[in-house]
Amino acid sequence: MLFKIKVFCSSVLLSLCALLSTAQQIDYPSTDQVAADFKKLLERPHVPLNPSFEVTKTDSVIIEHGFIYSEKNERVPILIYKPTTGARTYPAVIFLHGTGGKKEDNKKILYQLVKRGIMGVSIDARFHGERIAGGAHGSKEYVAAATAAWENKDKARQTHPFLFDTAFDLWRVTDYLVSRSDVAPNRLGMGGISMGGIETWLAASADQRIKVIVLDISVQSFKWSLDNNKWQGRVGTIQGAHLQAAKDLGDSTLNKRNIKAVWDKLLPHITDEFDCPSLLRLMAPRALLVVGTENDPNCPLPGANIAYASAMQAYISKNATNKISRDIAPKLFHTSTPEHFKMTLDWFSKWL
C-alpha cells in the first residue's frame, strides 16, 4: 500500500504506477463542461453582498467578525484574521471547518496564516455556527436540514444543504474578497478539513480565482464507496436523513439503493460528473496539496487513490506535476494530524 506520495518532476513516474492501475474508467465530460454544469446547477439570483463587519485590533492581528449575503435571505457569517504589517494588499486563504464545527474552530490556523503574512478567512457552513440563531448544536440542525431537503416535494424549491449550498456561498465569499482593496485578487487559496475539504474541492474546482488548494481528509470517490459497500462513514455524517429516506422507501435498513436516492437528490451527479475524481481534474495546473489517512472510513483510501490518480493525469497533461503533492499518514482513521497542519501552512506559504 502506498502511504506517502510526494510527487515532483523527478519522481512522477514511480509514484503513479500504483495509483493509475486502480483508477476506475469513467468517461467524464470535459473539464470545461463539468465546470459549466456545476455552476448552472448551483446558480441562483444575484444579490448585493452588503458586507457588515466589526473590527478588533491587537498588536499581532486585526480581527474582523461579520457577514455578507450570498442570497436574499442567506447571511454568511465570516471571521477574518488580517496581518498588522500595513502592507497594501495581502494574499488570502479561506479555510473551512468540518461537520458539526464552526468558523471559530479555525482560529489557530487563521493566526498562523497571519504570522506568515496571509489573511485568514473562515465561514460557518450552512446550518452550522452562527447560521443558526443562538448557535448551532453541533450537526443537529445540519442533519435536520438534509432530512427536510430529502422530504421536499417541490422541485422549484429544492435545496442542497449537504455540501452544495455551502460551495455556492464560497463563490460569493470569494466575490467579496476580490472586492476588497487590501486583498491581492490573484493570490487566493482555499482549504478545509473533512466536510470543509469537500466543500473546498467542490467550490475551488469551478472557480479559477482560487490559485492554491489544500484538501485534508476529504478526497474520495463517492462512486467507489457506493459500489464497494464502503459508504458507512460518509453516510454517518447525516445519518438521520439517510434513515428517514430508508423508511420512506420502505426499507428496514440502509442499503445502496436508498443511499444513492439521497445522494441523487441532495448531491445530484455526485457519483459521476461531480464526483471527486472528476472535479479534481479541474484544479490543474493550480497548486494542489492532498493529505489524508490510511484507514479513513469517511474517505476510503482506494477511492481517494482513484481521485488522486485522476488529478495527476490532468497535471501531467499540463506539465504541472511540480504543483501537486500528496501525503497519507499510515494507520490513522478520520483525523487531521499536526504534520498535515504544518504541511498545509507551508503549502499556502510556498505558492501564495
Regions found by a protein language model. Give the residues of each.
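Mobile cap/lid helix-loop segments that gate and shape the active-site cleft of serine hydrolases
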Residues: 212-279, 300, 304-308, 316-321
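Alpha/beta-hydrolase fold nucleophile elbow
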Residues: 182-194
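Conserved strand-to-loop "acid loop" that flanks and positions the catalytic carboxylate
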Residues: 284-301
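Short glycine-enriched nucleophile-adjacent loop
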Residues: 197-208
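N-terminal cap/lid segment of alpha/beta-hydrolase-fold proteins
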Residues: 40-88
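Cap/lid segment of the alpha/beta-hydrolase catalytic domain
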Residues: 88, 99-168, 224-229
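Bacterial Sec-dependent N-terminal signal peptides
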Residues: 1-26
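C-terminal catalytic histidine-bearing segment of alpha/beta-hydrolase fold enzymes
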Residues: 245, 308-352
